Amino acid sequence: MEHTYQYAWVIPLLPLPVILSMGFGLFLIPIATKNFRRIWAFPSVLLLSIAMVFSVQLSIQQINGSSIYQYLWSWTINNDFSLEFGYLIDPLTSIMLMLITTVGILVLIYSDGYMSHDEGYLRFFIYISFFNISMLGLVTSSNLIQIYFFWELVGMCSYLLIGFWFTRPIAASACQKAFVTNRIGDFGLLLGILGFFWITGSLEFRDLFQTANNWIPNNGTTSLLTTLCAFLLFLGAVAKSAQFPLHVWLPDAMEGPTPISALIHAATMVAAGIFLLARLLPLFISLPLIMTFISLVGTITLFLGATLALAQRDIKRTLAYSTMSQLGYMMLALGIGSYQAALFHLITHAYSKALLFLGSGSIIHSMEPLVGYSPDKSQNMALMGGLRKYIPITRTAFLWGTLSICGIPPLACFWSKDEILSNSWLYSPFFGIIASFTAGLTAFYMFRIYLLTFDGYFRFHFQNYSSTKEGSLYSISLWGNRIPKGVSKDFVLSTTKSEVYFFSQNISISKGQGNTRNRIESFSTSFGSKNVFTYPHETGNTMLFPLLILLLFTFFIGFIGIPFDNETMDNGIAGVTILSKWLIPSINFTQESSNSSINSYEFITNAISSVSLVILGLFIAYIFYGSAYSFFQNLDLQNSFYKGSPKKNFFYQVKKKIYSWSYNRGYIDIFYSRLFTLGIRGLTELTEFFDKGVIDGITNGVGLASFCIGEEIKYVGGGRISSYLFFFLCYVSVFLFFFLS
């Protein structure tokens, strides 16, 4: 066992030889390296698999009751200061190692098929392998300096992958947006690290936690500087994990390739912020004000993310807002001290969300040959529908992933989300109400994605394309009926003859339909050329295999949080779980063990209430977006409901406001653009005017005045010495007159 821990430092370095080999190959033999580029996927997967084997062994040892191991190498700068580097193996590290390696392997396999025809195939594998190295180094770091170093590497890799297709202006802009937004959090993290070093004189977790224990007897009463430094550390996690108000970069990050979206949302970029808070939770627990602030930010984020996902038309952006909301649940759990529930949800959400993102990539991959390679079309749910007939394997995997995120038992996310909801109700009814209501919203917008993508008819055949702006924008009504008048007409989905609102399932097909599955029709692309298309088809085995493996994780990973100690269950208290055995040292450290047990009756009651909210959300989504909408439309119920003046109808106005709020991202991006972008631009223009008009004006004015005076004076003397003597005596006389008087 000791032997395994001694060589644990190898885990982050295992993927490095492949990166170096690809780099040297591109430098020395570029043509051969590019011609045989797909062979590099095998060593990438192989070495990360070896890292996974090491991680599994470490995790098993942690579950069996091993203690925390830390190895340090000291780098002495002078007699008074030494900088230590090393690695830390504890339950949190082992969980993150398992998560990163398993999801990373599946994403690498998936990427081999998804990126096979991309010119940047090798560059993508270099970036993604280095991404895995950075995250593995982050979770094994033994002090704050190492965390910050790998924190920056994780950010750098994410920026490179978000802007992978940098020739597209939108992707380049998304990369810049992610960079600038995360700079705010990273700067706060750096200041917080330096502040705690100034307070405690150490950057080691052990020393920080020992100092924090001294604050607890004082009822958390600490200096303002300590609270400020803790807030700055939290600011880093806010930006990295896309929490309000620094969440704006996450939806735009979907401009990167879909495999990296899965990795960012499951196991790397956004998980880094949650990991940082979990690692430093013993420090934050001693600061009640910061803990309350963390829970408040998490609550705002989980609700905001759910509301912003309600009316999005881009499938990946909707999933991005879903990730933002689920990260809010984890942040809320950490803020109320529910350490185990937060990590449990981090695990279950990672596999379910990776399944959904890779499933969306399979959908996009099947749509691109038909609609083109523009994300506005291939990712637009307005052009999908009825895909269950054409990509059944993807549809099955996506459905189970959707139900898991919604919280349907016995899928993975049900167990973790239900634990967070129970703990939030125990901590504060305010947090419990918002978290429970958001669970219903989650079911609504997630099932909306599924219905718009797989239910009904394949709507692309009814869409008229043109090169005009009106023909290139599509949208989705929030409630399934006609777009409100307040929304721009550019967002209406229509055909050449009449408007077709695609959420209705009784769309009339053009005459001569026949066997439309085998029909080949022409359509006009945005380039104005005529082409032919068929229906979407299932992707290759290299893309389907990761979906099936993630589907198994979605089914069974939740059981690590289910009690298996029958004797304890007989006493009416929740028994020991695999996760609780895994986290025993950490739970003891955060003093959560007494709060994590819950009566069996309470568990069943809470589960029934949460599942009822989820079923209600699913039912409402089915009413507005499923086959049931056609039934209600045929009954003319909606027309009778709006028979009065619809503009004066309260429901109509609320619906329009919600749609506008959600579709426009809560107007937060617009607010930031006007406040910061336009404000800073105006400030720079004012500064430029002051610099050129005032500062340069004074300097240039003095020079110009001297020049003009000199030009006038030079004609006075005329070159005669008598004139010079005359003026000299006159000036001396005047000077003496004023001086003597």
Swiss-Prot record:
UniProtKB keywords: Chloroplast, Membrane, NAD, NADP, Plastid, Plastoquinone, Quinone, Thylakoid, Translocase, Transmembrane, Transmembrane helix, Transport
Transport listed as a keyword: yes
Keyword Ubl conjugation applies: no
Listed GO biological process terms: ATP synthesis coupled electron transport; electron transport coupled proton transport
Subcellular location(s) per record: Plastid, Chloroplast thylakoid membrane
Main location: plastid
Transmembrane segments: 9-29, 39-59, 89-109, 125-145, 147-167, 184-204, 216-238, 258-278, 280-300, 327-347, 354-374, 396-416, 425-445, 544-564, 612-632, 721-741
Topology of this chain in the membrane: Multi-pass membrane protein
Reactions catalysed according to its record: a plastoquinone + NADH + (n+1) H(+)(in) = a plastoquinol + NAD(+) + n H(+)(out); a plastoquinone + NADPH + (n+1) H(+)(in) = a plastoquinol + NADP(+) + n H(+)(out)
Matches recorded under InterPro entries: NADH_UbQ_OxRdtase_chlpt_su5_C, NADHpl_OxRdtase_5_subgr, ND/Mrp_TM, NU5C-like, Proton_antipo_N
Its EC number(s): 7.1.1.-
Role according to the record: NDH shuttles electrons from NAD(P)H:plastoquinone, via FMN and iron-sulfur (Fe-S) centers, to quinones in the photosynthetic chain and possibly in a chloroplast respiratory chain. The immediate electron acceptor for the enzyme in this species is believed to be plastoquinone. Couples the redox reaction to proton translocation, and thus conserves the redox energy in a proton gradient.
UniProt-recorded name of the protein: NAD(P)H-quinone oxidoreductase subunit 5, chloroplastic
Organism: Brachypodium distachyon
